[in-house]
Amino acid sequence: MSVLSGILKTFVGDKSKKDLKGLYPLVDKIHQATQVLSELSHDELRAKTLEFKQHIAEIRKPLYDEINEVKSRIEALSDVDEKESLYAEIDRITTQAHDEVAAYLDNILPEAFAVVKETAKRFKDNEQLVVTATPFDRTLSAIKSNVKIKSDKALWANSWDAVGKPVTWDMVHYDVQLVGGIVLHQGKIAEMQT
């Protein structure tokens, strides 16, 4: 069987190599987006995540409104067959919402991954990041020792206690880790051999 596999690889090629070859253009886009994001302030970089979330909410809102309208029509009905057709309509709208959000996530993948990579770089290069405090920062500061609030600023330390052991962030994502993240985003299984 291994002889046959070798012959097939010679003529057809190695599937994993082909798959990887298709992912590296996305990795290049992540690097390009990271360069652009490196010019942003800490607050501007954080705002990118909110921008992503708001756009997802904008995609979902009209569809969820439509689902709620269909649900209210269902409540007014007693005919089981009519209800069944409306439940099928809800399923169709839910699938549409999922598909539209998935398309948006695929579209922003390079920039979203770049936000994470740039954030990791900033934590690696700085002992502390100072940002405008948000309600989330205030909540986290009550339970996490590496987040402090001073006036209207949140101070995020790059080291913290993990089960009694001090840990300092010292990593920026390698290309192979970006590839692994892309593969997982695509719903595939990835085995990291690093």
Per-segment meaning from a language model:
Residues 16-193:
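Conserved pre-motif I regulatory segment
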